From Swiss-Prot:
Keyword Endoplasmic reticulum on entry: no
Biological function: This is one of the proteins that bind and probably mediate the attachment of the 5S RNA into the large ribosomal subunit, where it forms part of the central protuberance. In the 70S ribosome it contacts protein S13 of the 30S subunit (bridge B1b), connecting the 2 subunits; this bridge is implicated in subunit movement. Contacts the P site tRNA; the 5S rRNA and some of its associated proteins might help stabilize positioning of ribosome-bound tRNAs.
One GO cellular component term noted in the UniProt record for this chain: ribonucleoprotein complex
GN (gene name): rplE
Stretches that traverse the bilayer: none
Gene3D superfamilies with a match to the protein in the record: 3.30.1440.10
Family under the similarity heading: Belongs to the universal ribosomal protein uL5 family.
Keyword tRNA-binding included in the entry's annotation: yes
Alphabetically ordered keywords of this record: Ribonucleoprotein, Ribosomal protein, RNA-binding, rRNA-binding, tRNA-binding
Annotated protein name in UniProt: Large ribosomal subunit protein uL5
Cysteines paired by S-S bonds: none
Length: 194
């Protein structure tokens, strides 16, 4: 009987985009903006992924599938988000579960960023580049994804309903221009400026 051999990945190994950031992006940013101190160079701090399931009030099963899908995509257990106040028009009670969220940091963040840029974004229908107008003025970038099926971890045959998500890239950049250059250097496929 043949023995299984597993190749273990060292726990101290860096993610591909983390290595890219340390070796190339920091140099490009310091040359462009003239940073004197390494600690002033903007970095990606966290990625927050949020799925809002408004129909969870009438169909609680949809929230369960959204939680499972978000766990598959990120490799981390999602936090359930509850409504803060009751809204009768939406048949929503205070404290009712209406969504889920995951916050990724460090290695998991860079691995998700790698999968997002390399695998998921090219699978977006009619993709012509990400808009550069979604910066918030403080160096953070948020994108709305309409379909969770762009991620290869999701099996299209097993999902009951296509739902979207909001992905926020939080950086330590002070301005939107710094954040734009940081994300573009990391490989974020923005629309070409004329």
């Amino acid at each position: 009987m043949a023995q299984k051999t597993e190749t273990a990945i060292p726990s101290n190994s860096k993610a591909r985009f983390e290595t890219l950031y340390r070796e190339k992006v920091t140099k490009a940013l310091s040359e462009r903006f003239g940073y004197k101190n390494v600690m002033n160079i903007p970095r990606l701090q966290k990625i927050s992924i949020n799925i809002g399931v408004g129909e969870a009030a009438s169909e609680p099963k949809l929230l369960e599938t959204a939680i499972q899908e978000l766990a598959q995509i990120t490799g981390q257990k999602p936090q359930i988000r509850k409504s803060k106040k009751a809204i009768s028009n939406f048949k929503l009670r205070e404290g009712q579960a209406i969504g889920c969220r995951v916050t990724l940091r460090r290695k998991a963040m860079y691995e998700f960023f790698d999968r997002f840029v390399s695998l998921a974004v090219p699978r977006i229908r009619d993709f012509r580049g990400l808009s550069d107008t979604s910066f918030d003025g403080r160096g953070n970038y948020t994108i709305g994804v309409r379909e969770q099926i762009i991620f290869p971890e999701i099996d299209i045959d097993k999902i009951p309903k296509i739902c979207g998500m909001d992905i926020s890239f939080v950086t330590s950049a002070k301005t939107d221009e710094e954040a734009y250059v940081l994300l573009a250097e990391l490989g974020m496929p923005f629309k070409k400026k004329n």
